[in-house]
Amino acid sequence: MCLSLLLTVVSSRAGAADDPLARARLLYNQRQFQAAVTAAEEARSTPARADAADLVAARAYLERFRESAATDDLTNARERLRRLDPQRLAPRERVEYIVGLGETLYFDQSFGAAAAVFESVLQSGELLAVVARDRVLDWWADAVERDVRPRPEMDRRGVYSHIRERMEDELALHPSSSTAAYWLAAAARGQGDLQAAWDAAQAAWVRSPLAADQGATLRADVDRLVQRAIIPDRAKSSAQSPQALQQEWERFKDRWKR
């Protein structure tokens, strides 16, 4: 996920041509990750900018790893995060650094540790644009869920309850949060509260136009959740057939078709 390096781009495109660090940031935001790494390595030759350059390179390597799953990319990201001095970063860059640590832990499958790192970013409440915060929130919820999967059912339900509470709070503060709308339904389902999951899925569907992309991504995600998880679970626990629940869901979507 490209999170919030856009916050740190202050140079124009023309200026980026003469400034390798600005060029690296611009290329990162354009998803040209190898070119961003190359520009960051050039910027690193200036000692005062080496740490910021390593941060851009680390984030670019993390994005490459998400696309390729090549272990070298994850190793390179970890190496750059390990060697940079966060005290030399600007405040917004330090937030990016912490998010990068969380992503690296997540990709290392240290999900509990990753969740703790993402939690610290969310709790700070500072220096994150709304869209970037939404993505960190998604990283957090996914890391928490993956961490709890092997645990006993009683433990899982308690964790899903925590996710629900967090998402309710997020929606109260940020009504356009697609992540909170989705995870409110997903966590209710994980907790075994299937009626609440169904209700939250419908609520997410109708509020989806608040999202930056007019709700296209949220609706697709909610539709998968309902059809692959909530409907089968409700059918098992009620007298309704999967076909009847599917028809009910389709009628609901038709009423709110855009």
Q: For the regions a protein language model found, what residue spans apply to each?
A:
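Helix-turn-helix repeat elements of alpha-solenoid scaffolds
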Residues: 25-41, 68-82, 108-120, 152-165
